[in-house]
Amino acid sequence: MSKIKQSLRKSLFNRYFALCSAVTLATVAIMGALVIGFSASYFSETTRASLRKNAEQAVEITLVGMEDYGYQKVPVSTVQNGYRIISSTTETQIFLVNLEGKTLLCSEGENCNHRTYSISEDIIKKAAAGEYDGSGTLGGIYDTSHYTVGIPIKHGEEVLAVLFASTE
């Protein structure tokens, strides 16, 4: 009789052990997924806030440069050097686009892939309204997904151009 009781105890122990192990494993998996989800969200928000700050600094450089020309011309060398400084310290690509979506200046110089493509009209409209904030290939400009922020360059209420800042 003793062997039967011992066998039942082992069997009961194994069942409870398996149940507790499964619950613990499921809890750890759920908690891990939550941590990864919150971390990804935090990283995304931090990246976008950093991009917006970089873009705002680039807009200031652009407006200061354009001021000497009555906001009719962009002094390429001055503004592009400012973009390069911001870009190199923050690992951000900065480019200035006219309202038709064509790239005028880029932190990467003359031979950048931004000059090959035009930004779509709806992205330009959102950025001109100060609302563009997205991730993706930006209409095929990038091969991989990039975070991108678009900010209008305004003189008074007039939108002169749009500035984009992107990073992987």
Q: Which residues are covered by each model-predicted region?
A:
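Extracytoplasmic/periplasmic sensor domains and loops in membrane signaling proteins
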Residues: 77-80, 108-144
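Helix-start (N-cap) segments at beta->loop->alpha junctions
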Residues: 154-156, 163-168
